[in-house]
Amino acid sequence: MTLELLKLTDEYVQYKFFPEDDKSNFGIVQVDVKEPAKRFVVQDAKNVSGMYKGMAMVRVSLLVKNGEFPQTSACAWC
């Protein structure tokens, strides 16, 4: 799955997530930059496992905790 930075403000960050790297089907997750545990799905990807949105929220929360806001990021199933 790939992530692409969509929006970064003083309050939150939003990333698009692309399950299976399919650019035609994406979701959007938002994470609070001060409290990374505050996170939710703005838009869900269609016809894919809900695990993708969970993985996207966890990955973006980890980036926020590390103070990292890359333009793109990737994560794989462990």
Where is each model-derived feature located?
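Acidic, low-complexity intrinsically disordered segments
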Residues: 28-78
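N-terminal acidic leader/helix
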Residues: 3-32
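A broad, low-specificity signal for short, low-complexity segments enriched in glycine/proline
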Residues: 1-2, 50
